[in-house]
């Protein structure tokens, strides 16, 4: 998986791809069903592994990770402007407006800082898969924040123990923290419409 601030195209992929495939096959053997949507951080190995398992499942690239990657391609003096344009695009109110601002973003940043535009194009339509979902789900579907917050909270709770004797111990500790309420989870935004499948992709081609 991508480290924070690391460029997606700089990641080692093949060993990680095999590790992810092996882990996924274990979960499938335990009853994991084909997902309706894959939400990933942008790691090339992760994306390749999941695509080999579920080639027809829509994939959403985390918009927070992509924002960090855009900033890594821009001089610090432009960070505020990149962020403003990116947020205007990602948090637009309709699918059509998201796509309109995507085109404007690329036109502007191809001229102003080519690396920023190239980084956005690297993700392609996978950065905008959330627009195929009911709008009530957009907040949760845009990022991997929910999973990462849970992970960070778990690490914070066990930081004094540093090393656990086994994976089973880690799982037991996690569920005990969850059951006791020390770690809490909330329903994802738009949970009422989760049964609705993603719409077909009808995104305008970006000039």
Where are these regions (language model features)?
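Catalytic center-proximal scaffold of phosphoryl-transfer enzymes
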Residues: 1-207
């Amino acid at each position: 998986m991508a480290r924070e601030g690391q460029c997606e195209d700089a990641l080692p992929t093949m060993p990680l791809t095999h590790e992810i495939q092996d882990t996924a096959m274990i979960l499938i053997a335990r009853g994991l069903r084909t997902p309706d949507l894959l939400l990933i951080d942008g790691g090339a190995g992760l994306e390749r592994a999941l695509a080999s398992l579920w080639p027809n499942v829509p994939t959403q690239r985390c918009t927070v990770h992509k924002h960090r990657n855009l900033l890594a391609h821009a001089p610090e003096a432009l960070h505020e402007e990149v962020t403003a344009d990116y947020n205007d695009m990602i948090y637009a109110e309709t699918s059509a407006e998201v796509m309109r601002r995507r085109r404007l973003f690329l036109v502007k940043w191809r001229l102003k800082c080519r690396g920023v535009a190239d980084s956005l194009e690297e993700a392609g339509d996978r950065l905008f898969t959330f627009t195929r979902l009911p709008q009530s789900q957009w907040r949760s579907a845009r990022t991997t924040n929910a999973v990462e917050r849970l992970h960070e909270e778990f690490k914070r709770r066990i930081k004094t123990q540093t090393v656990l004797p086994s994976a089973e111990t880690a799982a037991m500790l996690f569920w005990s923290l969850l059951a006791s309420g020390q770690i809490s989870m909330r329903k994802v935004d738009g949970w009422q419409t989760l049964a609705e499948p993603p719409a077909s992709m009808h995104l305008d081609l970006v000039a």
